[in-house]
Amino acid sequence: MCDEEVAALVVDNGSGMCKAGFAGDDAPRAVFPSIVGRPRHQGVMVGMGQKDSYVGDEAQSKRGILTLKYPIEHGIVTNWDDMEKIWHHTFYNELRVAPEEHPVLLTEAPLNPKANREKMTQIMFETFNTPAMYVAIQAVLSLYASGRTTGIVLDSGDGVSHTVPIYEGYALPHAILRLDLAGRDLTDYLMKILTERGYSFTTTAEREIVRDIKEKLCYVALDFEQEMATAASSSSLEKSYELPDGQVITIGNERFRCPEALFQPSFLGMEANGIHETTYNSIMKCDVDIRKDLYANTVLSGGTTMYPGIADRMQKEITALAPSTMKIKIIAPPERKYSVWIGGSILASLSTFQQMWISKQEYDESGPSIVHRKCF
């Protein structure tokens, strides 16, 4: 089998979900929760073949008897043993491939510590024996997926949000800003404000229900105060949702109060700037000559940018902050939930990229630090 036929594997490890598949595909084959669960109790049934750990959907469905851990916190891997289990599950159970036969493209959070990139590299070559690998910054891949090489990406997932200015394909590290406010915080906030309505959601299982309510019914208001007034005076904004047990709940202003926290983190008791100010501050940290290009190419990426109305609201807020003559364009691709993965799929299948891979041979000669020389 010649090299041309071996598809590279693309794995985008997010705080909440892991997206994996083959380079050249237009969507990931496998999308599963980034969780590892271990049994809380000793098994009583003899011969049940109890596993000592469960990953992804299986961990999710057995969560009643497991202790769940997320090895990726705020976009950064903090537990390598569990991370290894997630990668093992990705290759062998989800994609059903032998990692020693495929180059692997991994993604990393912006500002990922150097030691972390080295550790990822080491695990790929030493544990999984991959023939070649590469580590790419998530936001840069999202920008590629939108067909650009210059722009600013607001990437907001489950565990962390970043604003990443990119010029001619290179992220500008001095201007990257991180906001520890993302999907998980919004789910928690929605649990809290639904409790105020008299619906009690407390367990991890119930949190998943609230996440579903959030994904199906929430939206961003163009004018928050005006929307609050509308919600107070009529029931036109109310929607109902059927819980798994058949009970139907009604939600009104919670629909837009929940994602409003992205623009007003004070709702969550956080002293931080909203995503619009963070984006603006990120642009202002860049060279004055490239700001025009960033304002005109502001790309939204990640699951937490999927709320209806978010692009219009960003346009309005950034227009208010920017110089009055500035052309501002917010790009919100419909597939932005997976745009990091899609960008990776595009990158790994480019003919010009093939000399960029770190080969097993190069790794054996230089060790894990090779990653800083070849992936930047």
Swiss-Prot record:
Propeptide: 1-2
Molecular function GO terms recorded: ATP binding; hydrolase activity
Modified residues (N-acetylaspartate): 3
Origin: domain of life: Eukaryota
Free-text tissue specificity from the UniProt record: Brain of newly enclosed adults.
Positions carrying Methionine sulfoxide: 45, 48
SUPFAM superfamilies attached to this UniProt entry: Actin-like ATPase domain
Enzyme Commission number: 3.6.4.-
Compartment(s): Cytoplasm, Cytoskeleton
Keyword line: Acetylation, ATP-binding, Cytoplasm, Cytoskeleton, Hydrolase, Nucleotide-binding, Oxidation
Reactions it catalyzes: ATP + H2O = ADP + phosphate + H(+)
Modifications the protein undergoes after translation, according to the UniProt entry: Oxidation of Met-45 and Met-48 to form methionine sulfoxide promotes actin filament depolymerization. Methionine sulfoxide is produced stereospecifically, but it is not known whether the (S)-S-oxide or the (R)-S-oxide is produced.
Major localisation: cytoplasm
Family as reported in the entry's similarity comment: Belongs to the actin family.
Function: Actins are highly conserved proteins that are involved in various types of cell motility and are ubiquitously expressed in all eukaryotic cells. Multiple isoforms are involved in various cellular functions such as cytoskeleton structure, cell mobility, chromosome movement and muscle contraction.
Protein name: Actin, cytoplasmic A3a
Source organism of the structure: Helicoverpa armigera
